[in-house]
């Protein structure tokens, strides 16, 4: 169906768009090409009383087999990136890896930790993503969001309420539109060296040859999730087509047409086993949504 020349897909699978290559059907799916189109879609759903879910590149999401009700919006066509002196303004759907490369090309340091991290700028801000000693809250100075009342609001750093894998957008209903990164000048050679070092670590430690969400669990205080899982002898354990990676225990990989339910079942089994063995509850870093 069409809404002001915006294509809306009905009963459409999210699996082809997801990094896990798993996920159920959504009632309606749309991919806006502008903020105006995003507003039109949100208003349409609101008028019909439909729930709205907004996603970036589905790198940190598990959708159960029963799928999602209402309207699901993917922002990956909102991907403008503008470099202005030591600042980069990136749209929510921009690939974080691409933004990291733009920083390198302009001799701007601070995003090297993002080299090789899949996902969108919006998703990275939403989760306060980070790796190898770097994190979104160390480099983002402001964020623009579309609020539930239909207005665009600018959030300065303090108002973003960043925490470990947390931001204000997990509770205020705002849809992230763009983020401003404030970086530091450095030589391109030094920046590339740090990026290459991080990519080398990833290639050696992570199962990059299979679909996955990356790190499944948050780091529990005083522990490392991957080591707890490894010490629980859970590597190689499967539920359906999803397996605890033999290469990195903190990852779950889709090795044989796994489903969203397979991921969730394996997550619950790992949580239960680790808690019984060590008394530590593993909290998921990935988001699990939808109906069983």
From Swiss-Prot:
It is found in: Cytoplasm. The keyword Cytoplasm applies. It comes from Leuconostoc mesenteroides subsp. mesenteroides (strain ATCC 8293 / DSM 20343 / BCRC 11652 / CCM 1803 / JCM 6124 / NCDO 523 / NBRC 100496 / NCIMB 8023 / NCTC 12954 / NRRL B-1118 / 37Y). Pathway: Cell wall biogenesis; peptidoglycan biosynthesis. GO terms for biological process: cell division; cell wall organization; peptidoglycan biosynthetic process; regulation of cell shape. This is UDP-N-acetylenolpyruvoylglucosamine reductase. Its main location: cytoplasm. Cell wall formation. The keyword Cell division applies. GO terms for cellular component: cytosol. Keywords: Cell cycle, Cell division, Cell shape, Cell wall biogenesis/degradation, Cytoplasm, FAD, Flavoprotein, NADP, Oxidoreductase, Peptidoglycan synthesis. Its cofactor is FAD. Residues 21-186 form the FAD-binding PCMH-type domain. It comes from the Bacteria. One of its GO terms (molecular function) is FAD binding. HAMAP family: MurB. Pfam families: FAD_binding_4 (PF01565), MurB_C (PF02873). The active site is at 165, 215 (proton donor), 285. It catalyses: UDP-N-acetyl-alpha-D-muramate + NADP(+) = UDP-N-acetyl-3-O-(1-carboxyvinyl)-alpha-D-glucosamine + NADPH + H(+). Its EC number is 1.3.1.98.
């Amino acid at each position: 169906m069409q809404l002001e020349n915006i294509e809306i897909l009905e009963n459409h699978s999210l699996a082809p768009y997801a990094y896990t290559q798993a996920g159920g059907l959504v009632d309606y799916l749309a991919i806006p090409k502008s903020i105006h189109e995003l507003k039109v879609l949100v208003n349409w759903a609101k008028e019909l009383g439909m729930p709205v879910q907004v996603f970036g590149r589905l790198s940190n999401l598990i959708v159960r087999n029963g799928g999602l009700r209402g309207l699901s919006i993917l922002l990956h066509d909102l991907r403008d990136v503008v470099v202005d002196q030591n600042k980069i303004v990136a749209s929510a759907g921009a690939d974080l890896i691409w933004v990291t490369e733009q920083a390198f090309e302009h001799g701007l340091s601070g995003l090297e930790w993002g080299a090789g991290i899949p996902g969108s700028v919006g998703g990275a801000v939403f989760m306060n993503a980070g790796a190898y000693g770097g994190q979104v809250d160390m480099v983002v100075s402001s964020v623009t969001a579309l609020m539930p009342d239909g207005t665009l609001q600018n959030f300065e750093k303090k108002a973003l309420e960043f925490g470990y894998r947390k931001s204000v957008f997990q509770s205020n209903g705002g849809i992230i539109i763009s983020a401003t990164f404030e970086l530091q000048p450095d030589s391109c050679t030094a920046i590339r060296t740090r990026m290459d070092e991080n990519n080398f670590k990833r290639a050696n430690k992570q199962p990059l040859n299979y679909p996955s969400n990356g790190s499944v669990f948050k780091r529990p205080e005083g522990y490392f999730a991957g080591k707890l899982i490894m010490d629980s002898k859970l590597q190689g354990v499967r539920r359906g087509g999803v397996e605890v990676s033999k290469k990195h225990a903190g990852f779950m990989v889709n090795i044989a047409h796994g489903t969203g339910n397979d991921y969730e079942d394996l997550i619950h089994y790992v949580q239960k086993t680790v808690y019984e063995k060590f008394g530590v509850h593993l909290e998921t870093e990935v988001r699990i949504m939808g109906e069983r």
